């Protein structure tokens, strides 16, 4: 992987993207949203927790010993205040967070009690979209890495472009395919895709071949999370495949976000791509053994113990 950015910046990672209140509902048996007729399901357990892609990645980064700051949008309602308090309690700086005149992003998460797999229903108010004035080059220059997701893809592209211009490395959480996805890929140093995205972009089913096809548009490391199959990355011409760790999963919510926190940590340690993926996979696996997104973030010593066992 490429050399690290300057180490003398106030923060290791700055995040812009989703910070959510999650209403987690644990259901007995398999979740099926495409049932042919109306149905009723009893909820076994209900939790109200904090999450969101970028917010969870920042919480993970701090848990591993990094300095993190959130500069994304938060609602001006009680849910937004709760997310802000949660970030602060986990050691994430929120000085540059943008409090918008809108309700905070939220999600309803249905968790299959047997497998831990989840279905996420989410909403984000248009008033949470960031404008050009909200993205300050000075704030972006204060971090070694700027991490963005694609919930506000316009802001993500602007932030990534500005961050690269001031010498920061940009990592991403790309979960959807839109007309601007490839702009975000091009603006990023390390695009990290959800499992389905490379195939959706290229039309190639095999993940490794899909990443190779994307190599024509991006010269750097390309990474994709693969759920229960782990993760893969294309580093130069080398395809690095890293299997998942086998755990007893109770909730897979936030696993990809925790993976990205592990990836950022490994990169800043100067590790090889293979070692970085293995660490990130171990972190993601541990997060699946607990409910919630931020609530499932492991500590570095827990990850190291799992690595020793594995």
Q: Where are the regions that the model predicts?
A:
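Glycine-rich phosphate/adenosyl-contacting loop at the front of the ribokinase-like
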Residues: 1-71, 248-249
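Conserved phosphate-binding/catalytic region of the ribokinase-like
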Residues: 1-14, 23-26, 42, 207-310
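Gly/Ala-rich phosphate-binding loop of Rossmann-like dinucleotide-binding domains
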Residues: 62, 164, 268
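Conserved phosphate-binding/catalytic loop of the ribokinase/pfkB sugar-kinase fold
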Residues: 97-99, 109-145, 150
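Conserved phosphate/ATP/ADP-binding segment of small-molecule kinases
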Residues: 157-241, 248
């Amino acid at each position: 992987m490429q050399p690290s950015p300057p180490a003398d910046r106030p923060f290791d990672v700055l995040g812009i993207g989703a910070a959510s209140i999650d209403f987690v509902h644990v259901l007995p048996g398999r979740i099926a949203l495409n049932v042919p007729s109306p149905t009723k399901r009893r909820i076994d357990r209900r939790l109200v927790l904090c999450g969101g892609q970028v917010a969870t990645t920042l919480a993970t980064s701090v848990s591993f010993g990094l300095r993190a700051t959130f500069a994304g949008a938060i609602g001006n309602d009680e849910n937004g205040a709760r997310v802000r308090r949660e970030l602060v309690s986990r050691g994430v700086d929120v000085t540059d967070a943008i409090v918008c005149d809108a309700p905070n992003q939220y999600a309803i998460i249905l968790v299959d009690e047997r497998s831990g797999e989840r279905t996420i229903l989410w909403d984000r108010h248009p008033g949470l979209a960031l404008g050009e004035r909200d993205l300050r080059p000075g704030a972006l220059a204060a971090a070694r890495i700027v991490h963005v997701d694609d919930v506000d893809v316009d802001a993500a592209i602007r932030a990534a472009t500005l961050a690269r211009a001031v010498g920061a490395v940009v990592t991403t959480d790309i979960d959807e395919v839109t007309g601007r996805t490839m702009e975000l890929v091009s603006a990023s140093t390390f695009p990290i895709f959800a499992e389905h995205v490379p195939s959706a972009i290229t039309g190639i089913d095999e993940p490794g071949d899909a990443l190779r096809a994307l190599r024509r548009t991006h010269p750097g490391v390309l990474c994709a999370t693969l759920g229960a199959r782990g993760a893969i990355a294309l580093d130069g011409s080398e395809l690095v495949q890293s299997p998942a760790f086998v755990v007893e999963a109770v909730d897979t919510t936030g696993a990809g976000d925790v993976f990205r926190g592990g990836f950022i940590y490994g990169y800043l340690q100067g590790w090889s791509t293979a070692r970085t993926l293995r660490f990130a996979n171990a972190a993601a696996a541990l997060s699946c053994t607990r409910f919630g997104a931020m609530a499932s973030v492991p500590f570095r010593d827990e990850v190291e113990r799992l690595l020793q066992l594995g």
